Design a protein with these regions (language model features):
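C-terminal motif of bacterial Sec signal peptides marking the signal peptidase cleavage site
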Residues: 11-13
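Bacterial N-terminal signal peptides that target proteins for export
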Residues: 1-4
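Activation targets extended, charge/polar-rich intrinsically disordered C-terminal tails
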Residues: 16, 138-211
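Residue-level signal for mature regions of secreted extracellular proteins and peptides
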Residues: 7-8
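Non-catalytic ligand/cofactor/substrate-binding and regulatory segments of enzyme domains
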Residues: 19-39, 49-157
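Short beta-strand scaffold segments in enzyme catalytic cores
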Residues: 43-46
Length: 211
């Protein structure tokens, strides 16, 4: 019921678009990205690897044979260990040990045709896409030499604090907002409010249940 209430509130209070960035002007090139929901907790963002500026995302090199790259952000233990009540409570109380996780895939239908995912396509302007890329690039934590901290294939140490008020869904919404989309990240603590906002300016490629 709480999530239903949040969805009702955000319907009346969503931010407008940043008009210099979104929507793309008529005739302007667009960069399609994909908001991919993994169920009750997690949402990530996917892009074409060929659209990613060279050297911007270290994880791009981990999946050199894939056509698409999905990336998400979250609490280290919550991502990399079996989720327990204790781990969830610790993360929601506030965790500075955060990570980025990337995964490669070769065709959007791989996600669309799976009952595990809900997928929404969002078309960005070149400028908006560049700002989204910077949002993700700036989330990578760096070592003392200025290099990304790789924890394994697709895994990287991240910046930012995960909490009940700043989740993986909030992080994804912040990227969309930086790209100019009409979304209010503060409402996007869980997937429902995030997808409810995105579906108003994106195109659902797979029917979503009650978002």
């Amino acid at each position: 019921m709480l999530e239903v209430g949040i969805v009702t509130l955000l319907a009346a209070g969503c931010a407008g678009p940043i008009k210099s960035l979104y929507p793309p002007r008529a005739g302007e090139p667009v960069r399609s990205i994909y908001v991919i929901n993994h169920g009750a907790l997690h949402t990530g963002l996917a892009v074409k690897r060929s659209d990613i500026p060279p050297g911007v995302w270290p994880a791009n090199r981990d999946y050199a044979k894939s056509k698409f790259l999905e990336i998400g952000w979250g609490d280290d233990d919550g991502y990399r260990k079996p989720l327990t009540v204790g781990i969830a409570a610790k993360a929601l109380a506030g965790s500075r040990r955060t990570v980025l996780l990337a995964d490669g895939f070769n065709a959007v239908p791989e996600k669309v045709n799976s009952p595990r995912f809900a997928v929404i396509q969002v078309d960005l302007s070149d400028s908006g896409f560049a700002r989204l890329c910077r949002h993700i690039e700036q989330t990578y934590a760096l070592d003392q030499s200025g290099r990304p901290i790789r924890l394994g294939k697709g895994w990287y140490r991240a910046r930012g604090t995960y909490s009940a008020f700043h989740t993986c869904n909030t992080w994804a919404a912040e990227g969309l907002r930086r790209a100019g989309c009409p979304i209010t990240p503060a409402y996007c603590l869980t997937p429902g409010p995030l997808l409810s906002q995105v579906r108003h300016f994106g195109r659902a490629l797979r029917p979503m249940e009650s978002f």
